[in-house]
Amino acid sequence: MIQMQSNLDVADNSGAKRVQCIKVLGGSKRRTASVGDVIVVSVKEAQPRAKVKKGDVHRAVIVRTKKDVRRPDGSVIRFDSNAAVLVSKNEEPIGTRIFGPVVRELRGRGFMKIISLAPEVL
């Protein structure tokens, strides 16, 4: 469950290390986002000479959360940290590599490019 002011790790090589959620997209009263949701983030920490700079505002897709993700078969999956992948306006990843596992739920949301770049899909 990601809400405004939540800090997330960045799971790609766009150059950002930490981002902060500044808006959950998908309705005016929507408060929280989960895996596969698109949020608006501000870059809080970035590598030097990278594609993105500190203070930049981008969209991001949540790929890992500490909060449980429930599957229809009753299984539960959770991670040690909250992580996101920065995407462009047309929801294409900014980076060319994805670090760490991502969840299968991204496939149903249409993020096939992220699924194909990820080293592991859980």
UniProtKB/Swiss-Prot annotation:
Q: Which Pfam families match?
A: Ribosomal_L14 (PF00238)
| Any one cellular-component term (Gene Ontology) | cytosolic large ribosomal subunit
Write the protein's name.
Large ribosomal subunit protein uL14
Record's function text: Binds to 23S rRNA. Forms part of two intersubunit bridges in the 70S ribosome.
Q: Which biological processes are named by the entry's GO terms?
A: translation
- Lineage of origin: Bacteria, Pseudomonadati, Pseudomonadota, Alphaproteobacteria, Sphingomonadales
Give yes or no: UniProt keyword Transcription regulation: no
Which family does the entry's similarity section mention? Answer: Belongs to the universal ribosomal protein uL14 family.
The primary gene name is rplN
**Classification via HAMAP family:** Ribosomal_uL14
Matching entries from InterPro entries are given as: Ribosomal_uL14 (IPR000218), Ribosomal_uL14_bac-type (IPR005745), Ribosomal_uL14_CS (IPR019972), Ribosomal_uL14_sf (IPR036853)
Under the subunit heading, UniProt states:
Part of the 50S ribosomal subunit. Forms a cluster with proteins L3 and L19. In the 70S ribosome, L14 and L19 interact and together make contacts with the 16S rRNA in bridges B5 and B8.
Sorted keywords for this record are:
Ribonucleoprotein, Ribosomal protein, RNA-binding, rRNA-binding
Molecular function per GO: large ribosomal subunit rRNA binding; structural constituent of ribosome
